[in-house]
């Protein structure tokens, strides 16, 4: 096994966690407020500070990262993605009194069985295109870093992603959307550069007929400050709007970052400066940039996550403790 692949997988996970934790400080802010806070906190040069709307500890992460840990725990123990065991872990998380939970997630994970989660997703979440479904994939894709690249491996990862997505999202577009992101992440972990990952994503978007991705690729390639999807035009200055959880914004920021940045820190700071769903947006791009630019994640940010002391939360959800989940890292 190539040690660099293992390093990229490890830093994809850490990059996601750092992005989530950093972004949580600015969650739900407007663009101007986010920019002012970044300057006030000296762009987190001394480490992550927590706080935010939920009063988090420095280095503490949010709900979807905790959910990603549920996936990691199953893959670590069994070596593969087991939908039934993951569903059990998801429900355990739901019962842990999380400090935040989105409506889409609550609708499904409040059910106590895999089949009931899928039924609830079909009943209540058909219209949801929320971004947490992509965010938690950093707990899945990097865990298979040591699989030999092949069409069989691609199908294996695609199946796992699809099985995970349907636990919370039943919109038929969300499966391909998640698969495209997941395969881009795996591609980066295997050592492909940002340009190749960007082009690979576009090929996947064409292959799986993802109108959302194709529209966003057109926007990024043309350097527009908007993209069109389902007869609606989305503008860059709407990222902090009431529709901030739309997965399209997360994908847009990710693809813009791939074209613009070659450094983890700069990409994450710019994403957060837009305000809105800063934790999720930074996490989704953070995983990809952690794999691509693994040596550019500020060590002080990684240390903040690895040394987090959210002891009260660990009592209800023990696997959020770095002493536990750090043992599962590649």
From Swiss-Prot:
Keyword match Transmembrane: no
Entry keywords, A to Z: Hydrolase
Transmembrane parts of this sequence: none
UniProt keyword annotation of Nucleus present: no
GO molecular function: hydrolase activity
EC number: 3.2.2.-
InterPro entries: ADP-ribosylglycohydrolase, Ribosyl_crysJ1, Ribosyl_crysJ1_sf
Name of a matching Pfam family: ADP_ribosyl_GH
EC category: hydrolase
Family: Belongs to the ADP-ribosylglycohydrolase family.
Name by which UniProt lists this protein: Putative ADP-ribosyl glycohydrolase L543
Organism: Acanthamoeba polyphaga mimivirus (APMV)
């Amino acid at each position: 096994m190539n040690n660099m692949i293992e390093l990229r997988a490890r830093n994809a996970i850490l990059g996601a966690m750092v992005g989530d934790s950093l972004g949580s400080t600015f969650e739900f802010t407007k663009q101007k407020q986010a920019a002012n806070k970044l300057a006030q906190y000296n762009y987190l040069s001394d480490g992550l500070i927590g706080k935010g709307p939920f009063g988090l500890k420095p280095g503490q992460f949010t709900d979807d990262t905790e959910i990603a840990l549920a996936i990691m725990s199953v893959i670590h123990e069994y070596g593969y993605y087991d939908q039934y065991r993951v569903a059990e872990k998801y429900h355990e998380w739901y019962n842990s009194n999380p400090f935040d939970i989105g409506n889409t997630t609550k609708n499904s994970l409040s059910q106590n069985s895999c089949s009931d989660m899928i039924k609830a997703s079909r009943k209540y979440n058909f219209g949801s295109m929320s971004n947490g479904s992509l965010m938690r994939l950093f707990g899945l894709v990097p865990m298979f870093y040591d699989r030999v690249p092949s069409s069989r491996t691609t199908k294996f990862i695609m199946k796992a992603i699809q099985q995970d997505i349907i636990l919370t999202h039943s919109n038929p577009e969300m499966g391909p959307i998640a698969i495209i992101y997941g395969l881009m992440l795996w591609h980066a972990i295997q050592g492909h550069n940002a340009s190749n990952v960007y082009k690979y994503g576009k090929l996947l978007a064409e292959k799986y007929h993802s109108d959302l991705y194709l529209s966003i690729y057109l926007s990024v390639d043309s350097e527009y400050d908007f993209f069109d999807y389902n007869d609606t035009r989305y503008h860059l200055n709407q990222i902090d709007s009431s529709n901030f959880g739309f997965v399209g914004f997360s994908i847009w920021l990710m693809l813009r970052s791939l074209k613009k940045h070659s450094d983890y820190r700069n990409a994450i700071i710019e994403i957060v400066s837009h305000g809105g769903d800063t934790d999720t947006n930074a996490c989704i791009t953070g995983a990809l940039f952690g794999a691509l630019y693994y040596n550019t994640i500020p060590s002080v940010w990684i240390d903040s996550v690895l040394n987090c002391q959210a002891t009260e939360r660990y009592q209800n959800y023990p696997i959020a403790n770095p002493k536990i989940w750090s043992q599962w890292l590649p």
